[in-house]
UniProtKB/Swiss-Prot annotation:
UniProt GO MF annotations: structural constituent of ribosome; zinc ion binding
Gene Ontology CC entries for this record: cytosolic small ribosomal subunit; ribosome; rough endoplasmic reticulum
Cofactor: Zn(2+)
Annotated protein name in UniProt: Small ribosomal subunit protein uS14
GO annotation terms (biological process): cytoplasmic translation
Species lineage: Eukaryota, Metazoa, Ecdysozoa, Arthropoda, Hexapoda
Protein species of origin: Plutella xylostella
Length: 56
């Protein structure tokens, strides 16, 4: 049983390890509200494309 078989063999059905950004696959700073599932860095990049408007 080599390293490749053991690495990431634990089931990830819930928790922080089960979710990732849909744009960059990052697991930190996820925005899950409204089903976005996008990290905060990508949200800043794609906010206008998604339809979020910045109010002054």
């Amino acid at each position: 049983m080599g390293h490749a078989n053991i690495w990431y063999s634990h089931p990830r059905k819930y928790g922080q390890g089960s979710r990732s950004c849909r744009a960059c696959s990052n697991r930190h700073g996820l925005i899950r509200k409204y089903g976005l599932n996008i990290c905060r860095q990508c949200f800043r990049e794609y906010a206008n494309d998604i339809g979020f408007k910045k109010l002054d």
